[in-house]
Amino acid sequence: MCDDDVRALVVDNGSGMCKAGFAGDDAPRAVFPSIVGRPRHQGLMVGMGQKDSYVGDEAQSKRGILTLKYPIEHGIITNWDDMEKIWHHTFYNELRVAPEEHPVLLTEAPLNPKANREKMTQIMFETFNSPAMYVAIQAVLSLYASGRTTGIVLDSGDGVSHTVPIYEGYALPHAILRLDLAGRDLTDYLMKILTERGYSFTTTAEREIVRDIKEKLCYVALDFEQEMATAAASTSLEKSYELPDGQVITIGNERFRCPEALFQPSFLGMESCGIHETVYNSIMKCDVDIRKDLYANTVMSGGTTMYPGIADRMQKEITALAPSTIKIKIIAPPERKYSVWIGGSILASLSTFQQMWISKEEYDESGPGIVHRKCF
């Protein structure tokens, strides 16, 4: 299975970024924004070969003249025409493969509507003529990537966060909780609090700059109130950032106020529980006998769990909520930004997995509904 000609493809479609590559690799070959852009004005760009749409980085770089759309909202595909364009771009431009020659493993959000998985299956077999495909739940793949089959995954990306308890490889749907608070909201919040400092960021292009500031300078405080006091008393927490035009801005308490919203969604005007309470609530919805295993195997995954200090803070918060005798372990692997993809790469290259694929023959025989029988 090692040569590129027959290797399975693994495509993790996130709300913000699409990660794609070959099963057996240790990292995705292509990572690009999940966006499709269309020209705002017809016939404006002379001599540009006038494409009717652009995907990923190209859409990003031409964003000044395009209208950008994200076909995946809060982890769920909402625009199938644009999604097809993203998959087409993934196969033909990024990976440069013929999709009819490779099995493909796709990922889906927890609690993805049934009709959506059928539609994914249908597009793969009918539009791209895949020989075989499989749909796996993102959080389950992250758990596999950490070398476990039991645990609770906090998966937080750009568009949505989920807490997913998994026992012996199976997600427990009744205990999965979703929080519509993720990276994009934190970027927006940072834009807002930087405006209070007198820096104005408003356009979509400027939002990308703020996202970069967030990724480079933000961190989670172990004790928020104490950190606020430190920031007020001295400049020790201040950092400077150079904007593309050479202007240098200074940011202080914004560095930890931004990701604090994960623990205190009221900062964003949301009434939901913070990520620590959501993990706890998810565990409490599970059978009393497996809770101990979940507390001891709490795995973080996704780009929004990449803030320095987040694991220690999580440990502290969950310890405060859980029974005092219980052992709590937060696992935050360094590669967690891509752990969904890595889990997919591991799964698709296992010899025992080869009989799990849905083949073209099975699809032709049973139709899209086969996905519920073979992927669970």
Curated annotation (Swiss-Prot):
Propeptide residue span(s): 1-2
Modification after translation, per record: Oxidation of Met-45 to form methionine sulfoxide promotes actin filament depolymerization. Methionine sulfoxide is produced stereospecifically, but it is not known whether the (S)-S-oxide or the (R)-S-oxide is produced.
Protein role: Actins are highly conserved proteins that are involved in various types of cell motility and are ubiquitously expressed in all eukaryotic cells. Multiple isoforms are involved in various cellular functions such as cytoskeleton structure, cell mobility, chromosome movement and muscle contraction.
Catalytic activity entry: ATP + H2O = ADP + phosphate + H(+)
Cysteines joined through disulfide linkages: none
Subunit composition and interactions: Polymerization of globular actin (G-actin) leads to a structural filament (F-actin) in the form of a two-stranded helix. Each actin can bind to 4 others.
Misc remark: There are at least 5 different actin genes in this organism.
Keywords: Acetylation, ATP-binding, Cytoplasm, Cytoskeleton, Hydrolase, Nucleotide-binding, Oxidation
Alphabetized Pfam families for the sequence: Actin
Record flagged with keyword Magnesium: no
GO MF annotation terms: ATP binding; hydrolase activity
Top-level lineage group: Eukaryota
Documented EC number(s): 3.6.4.-
Similarity field: Belongs to the actin family.
GO cellular component: cytoplasm; cytoskeleton
Compartment list: Cytoplasm, Cytoskeleton
Organism: Bombyx mori (Silk moth)
Residues bearing the modification Methionine sulfoxide: 45, 48
Modified residues (N-acetylaspartate): 3
Protein's UniProt name: Actin, muscle-type A1
